[in-house]
Amino acid sequence: MGTLDTKGFTEEQEALVVKSWNAMKKNSAELGLKLFLKIFEIAPSAQKLFSFLKDSKVPLEQNTKLKPHAMSVFLMTCESAVQLRKSGKVTVRESSLKKLGANHFKYGVVDEHFEVTKFALLETIKEAVPEMWSPAMKNAWGEAYDQLVNAIKSEMKPSS
């Protein structure tokens, strides 16, 4: 498993992440797409990082490759957040972390892309569970996301 030590993710943060994820899980396809639409609204140039979007004339909402990609990113991000405290480390499927790191490296992802994604993720969650949203929940999801990003960055090198 891809792992990185997770200091600083508290029991309270875990509870907030789990509670909100349980409320969002059933809508993960729709929320994943919303996340990516927010990312591209904030940083339109980020579309160039995706081969299936580069020359596409199809509206983003109707792109058949964006939807499954967006859902898998949203699911992986949220599942990783939920597992963080239980496992004591960032956990994603076997070899995924190395692959994620290599892909993000290959496509030229930089810190700013991760920052835009974090902002878009927090906004997406806030809109998905407005009745639960609080500064503490924002911090919990922010911490979980930061730890996942640090784990991905630790693997950002050419694939061997």
Swiss-Prot record:
InterPro entries: Globin, Globin-like_sf, Globin/Proto, Leghaemoglobin-like. Pfam families: Globin. One of its GO terms (molecular function) is oxygen binding. GO terms for cellular component: cytoplasm; nuclear matrix. It catalyses: Fe(III)-heme b-[protein] + nitric oxide + H2O = Fe(II)-heme b-[protein] + nitrite + 2 H(+). The keyword Cytoplasm applies. A motif (Homodimerization) lies at residues 41-45, 111-123. It is found in: Nucleus matrix; Cytoplasm. Root specific. Residues 8-157 form the Globin domain. Coiled coil: none annotated. Induction: By hypoxia, but not by cold stress. Repressed in roots colonized by the mycorrhizal fungus Glomus sp. R10. This is Anaerobic nitrite reductase MHB1. It comes from Medicago sativa. The gene is MHB1.
